[in-house]
From Swiss-Prot:
Name of the molecule in the record: Epididymal secretory glutathione peroxidase
Function (record text): Protects cells and enzymes from oxidative damage, by catalyzing the reduction of hydrogen peroxide, lipid peroxides and organic hydroperoxide, by glutathione. May constitute a glutathione peroxidase-like protective system against peroxide damage in sperm membrane lipids.
Pfam families recorded: GSHPx
Bilayer-spanning residue ranges: none
Amino acid sequence: MTTQLRVVHLLPLLLACFVQTSPKQEKMKMDCHKDEKGTIYDYEAIALNKNEYVSFKQYVGKHILFVNVATYCGLTAQYPELNALQEELKPYGLVVLGFPCNQFGKQEPGDNKEILPGLKYVRPGGGFVPSFQLFEKGDVNGEKEQKVFSFLKHSCPHPSEILGTFKSISWDPVKVHDIRWNFEKFLVGPDGIPVMRWSHRATVSSVKTDILAYLKQFKTK
């Protein structure tokens, strides 16, 4: 058998192997349920280092981006990008809210007082200070998850069908719409109703594009 014929015969096997080993394309964004009862104005959280509750009612009329954050994560580089996103879209009424969490890779290990110094001197470092509101560290999944995240997750299906490995899951109970990793994002409209949700794999740039498209549609209503 000639070399050319061998290649012809092997090609289908090589292609089959490629198809089987290629990772499935994950969705990055999912629209939220439109008939969900309640709004984020029913909830509140404790502001970081202030020991006072902030009612989300104060954001009535704003577009709010909820983000679960961590200081020692590979995605911590998104912090400056989130600063820039809020600054650029502030004229449109966008507000970013950050919620430190230690449930994913234990990448927010310190207490609340250590979060801002960690951001300033370690990651992203270089004197970085977040310009958006941060809240006290807490859970976003499991028995002790913050109630606002229970509402957000119930309102918005997760974009990905992949929950993760048992090794990576440290909370209980585990639910299908649980947050998978640091820096997932939820957009809430000016009426307090969740609009869309992004996987942690979505870049801030792609999130910005989606928000701008949403704002354009919003103006035409």
